[in-house]
Regions:
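Flexible "arm" and connector segments at domain edges
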Residues: 1-216
Length: 216
């Protein structure tokens, strides 16, 4: 998957859903990216899987994960992916990390970023190396927040000094680090980051305009 091409697809969908009806500051973008990392941490704290779908048939309050062990758990066991009660929305630790990546790609698309170095998910994962392989999710989230904070700092510093091109370039560099680590972590969970990215992007296409009038 070419990162720049996917960024344009993601940004087009964001525009179609009203997220760029008014321009947004880079600070807002950075905060929203970090909010996705925080949601990944909350999924981890709740002990939920990396990828899951809700069962919408359950009437009791709470979260019910669609994960039947056999036909005695659910009559739709053999047809689970087509079950009408299975939510279409992918959720979980890995999915929330992918959501953060989608927000980064949205900004890349907005700024028409062109990547000179590693420009595919596979290449970014190789760039991340093995330094993060044995880290727990909370440590990964801390690193991801650091990369985004660095991007925000460099962007603001350069904009303040009137260097718009440098602002984009420096912020992009740090956000690519975040993408590399997030994709690498997802891959190490046994999930395909490209497949998850495509899955969540396709779901996002079906969502309501501005997700029921969120302000940002």
């Amino acid at each position: 998957m070419n990162i720049c091409k996917m960024a344009q697809e993601v940004h087009e969908n964001a525009r179609n859903h009203g997220w760029w009806d008014e321009d947004r500051s880079f600070g807002t973008i950075a905060a929203l990216i970090c909010s996705e990392w925080a949601e990944a941490l909350e999924e981890h704290r709740a002990g939920r899987p990396n990828v899951w779908f809700a069962c919408e048939e359950a009437t009791e309050s709470g979260t019910f994960i669609c994960a039947p062990k056999d036909e005695f758990d659910c009559l739709e066991y053999d047809n689970i992916e087509n079950c009408k009660h299975r939510s279409k929305k992918p959720e979980g630790v890995a999915v929330e990390l992918i959501d953060g990546c989608i927000r980064i790609l949205d900004w890349f698309g907005r700024e028409n970023i062109r990547i000179a170095g590693p420009n595919t998910i596979e290449k970014l994962i190789r760039q991340a190396g093995h330094s993060y392989d044995n880290m727990e999710l909370p440590d990964i989230v801390a690193w991801l927040n650091l990369f985004v904070s660095r991007a925000f700092f460099e962007h603001r510093r350069n904009i303040t000094n009137g260097n718009k091109d440098s602002a984009r370039k420096d912020a992009c560099g740090h956000l690519l680090e975040a993408l590399a680590v997030a994709f690498s972590y997802v891959a190490n969970t046994g999930n395909d980051p490209e497949e998850l990215l495509r899955m969540k992007h396709e779901y996002n296409k079906t969502r309501s305009y501005r997700h029921n009038n969120k302000v940002c």
